[in-house]
Swiss-Prot record:
Residues 17-28, 105-114, 434-450 have a biased composition (Low complexity). Residues 185-208, 277-289 have a biased composition (Acidic residues). Pfam families: MFAP1. Coiled coil: none annotated. InterPro entries: MFAP1, MFAP1_C. Belongs to the MFAP1 family. Component of the spliceosome B complex. Keywords: mRNA processing, mRNA splicing, Nucleus, Spliceosome. Residues 1-291, 411-460 are annotated as: Disordered. Involved in pre-mRNA splicing as a component of the spliceosome. GO terms for cellular component: U2-type spliceosomal complex. This is Protein MFAP1 homolog.
Amino acid sequence: MSVASRIRDKLKNNLESSGGHSVVTSGTKVIRYRAGQRPDYAEAEDDQDSHFSNIQNQKSIKEAETNDPRLARFKNRSSNQDEPQSVEERKASRRRHHDDDNDNDTTTTTTTTTSRRIQKTEIIKEDDDNNNNNNNDTKKDHNDDDEDDDRRRRAKERYLKKKEEEEQKQKELEEKQQPFKDIEGESEEEGSSEYETDSEEDDEDEYWDQPPIFRPTFIKKDDRGTIKTDEQWEKEEQEQQAQLEREKEQRKIEAHRKLKDELDRDRKEQEAKELEQKEEEEYDDDEDQDGSKKLLWIQRELERVRLEIHTRLLAEFEKKEFARRRAMTDDQILKEDPSRSRTNIDNSQKKQLKFLQRDYHRGAFFQDDEYIKNKDFSAPTGEDKFNRELLPKVMQVKNFGKAGRTKYTHLKDQDTTEKDSLWNTNYNNKKKYNNNNNNSNSNSSNNNRDYNYRDRDNRS
């Protein structure tokens, strides 16, 4: 039943009890509705719900009690206390309890065990041979019970023995701590008896676990070791100074030792190098019997030394000469070295080139180099060394037989006086222009001459 239906039924009952009048308008009290306010009849509904929940809880408790195997065993045990049980029944109940403890079975297991017990009793009544087996089983069960009792008894003895050992250790510990208790006994007597409670033993255990506290004693100033006199301070300073001196001396000794080790190592390395060099000198496969190789070696060394000296002296001379000429003027340089002047260049050294010979320019750089300065650049090189005038007329061209060959050799064998040549196309126009200019210049000169004559006559 939903909450809305219960509310409708409640309102309907109230209307019927009030004779068909509204609950809100009946009586002097006016019931007003407010948003969020719980109505009066809601309390009754809550009570019903709580009653219903209590009933459900009671049912669940009863079900749990019925399903609990321990309660079932207790009920069976209490119900069977007045009835004398046989050996078979005790055995069956023990087996049933054992199965319940191991498997945590429900009441269904209990019912099955009871039914099993009934079947066993019937089998015992029907068959006499099984009685002997059951008797043997009962004997075994009794023996098992005796073993369990012995095991429990031994465990209890071990527990008691262990407890006695702990008590004995505690007594020995208290005897060791007894002197400290006597020292602190006087201060404890001053305390009130309100602290003597059940927790006193625990407090004492915590207290005795802490290190002992001794009573402070007064020591005279002269007997104290914390206050130092002037003599003690001076003695400590002297000891510190002596310690510093010892450390300094130790460092000096260590430095000397390291230096000695370094020198010894260098000496050993030098000796090893000398020994190796000596062995190399002694071991010579190519021995010089007549001394010719040694003479050649001496000559090479002399030449090398001479070249080094010459190079060094030449560098020094050039450096000085450069500094001297740098301070001179251009006129002084030309007077000192007239060969450098352009007017004194000798063109007679230039030779006549061969037929179809290439002409190489001397260049404008590296003129100070003796090799470049004295070299004859007009001398033929390569293919120019051959006389090409001896070749046939067809082969007297440049790059004969190559893709870059030319039709003409030079302008000497070409007629440059042709009228239809490119350089003669404007010759007639130039000649006409020059003639016209000459005529105009001659006429102007004649007019000037006549004017001069007339002027002279007039003045005369």
